[in-house]
Amino acid sequence: MTYKRVLLKLSGEALMGDKPYGIDPAIVQSIAEDVEKVIANNVQLAIVVGGGNIFRGLKGSADGMDRATADYVGMLATVMNAISLQDGLERVGVETRVQTAIEMQEIAEPYIRRRAMRHLEKGRVVVFGGGCGNPFFTTDTTAALRAAEINAEVVMKATKVDGVYDRDPNKFNEAKKYSSLSYQQVLSDEIAVMDSTAIALCKDNNIPIMVFDIFKKGNISRAVAGESIGSLIS
């Protein structure tokens, strides 16, 4: 089954590639080329991007910053990533709009739900930056929120691992990968795939979550085509 309207969640760390910080142009190029194939198949795609490659609000708070202030800095980091993604997408011919939850009209449109949906219907990619505009909410929660707002059929969480495991596969060789699991299992077992607010939002709105490896070339288009390449939460 090919999905028709998809919300893709990209972590900021995914944009780093092998770099310790910032944005790897080669990764942006690879993502853009994969997205171009998705759009060519008449799939409507919106993207929520994180900011952890530049600044992470929770870490800033742990280091002594006021939590709300740290979160706002993190929101600005997501806008930097959103604009960089827009540049990469437009260089491969994909018409793209950036919408931000915090107004900065010189560089992006303000987030307006109806306008975002019109862009999608016209075959444009919409990249949502600035989180949801409020501190104390993660970009995973933003992804769940925007998916519900634009009536997306699925949230696709593109990450550094190839699915959901019962423990950290980088630390435990015996870690077990789930091909599928329920929202309730994620919540009750406290599986660290997305925060509980994001999972609950998807559960309440019956939006499945596909978790897959972003670094394998072509995985975005495979996931959109409905291939079983990661873990499905539903």
Swiss-Prot record:
EC annotation from Swiss-Prot or TrEMBL: 2.7.4.22
Molecular functions per Gene Ontology: ATP binding; UMP kinase activity
Chief place of localization: cytoplasm
Catalytic EC class: transferase
Keywords: ATP-binding, Cytoplasm, Kinase, Nucleotide-binding, Pyrimidine biosynthesis, Transferase
Pfam families assigned: AA_kinase
Modulation of this protein's activity: Inhibited by UTP.
Reactions the enzyme catalyzes: UMP + ATP = UDP + ADP
GO BP term (any one): 'de novo' CTP biosynthetic process
Location(s) in or outside the cell: Cytoplasm
Binding site residues for UMP: G51, D71, C132, G133, N134, P135, F136, F137, T138, T139
Domain of life from the UniProt record: Bacteria
Binding-site residues, ATP: K9, L10, S11, G12, G52, R56, T159, Y165, D168
Pathway the protein acts in: Pyrimidine metabolism; CTP biosynthesis via de novo pathway; UDP from UMP (UMPK route): step 1/1
PANTHER family given in the database record: URIDYLATE KINASE (PTHR42833), URIDYLATE KINASE PUMPKIN, CHLOROPLASTIC (PTHR42833:SF4)
Assembly description: Homohexamer.
NCBIfam families cross-referenced by the UniProt entry: pyrH_bact
Biological role stated in the UniProt entry: Catalyzes the reversible phosphorylation of UMP to UDP.
The protein, known as: Uridylate kinase
Source organism of the structure: Prochlorococcus marinus (strain MIT 9515)
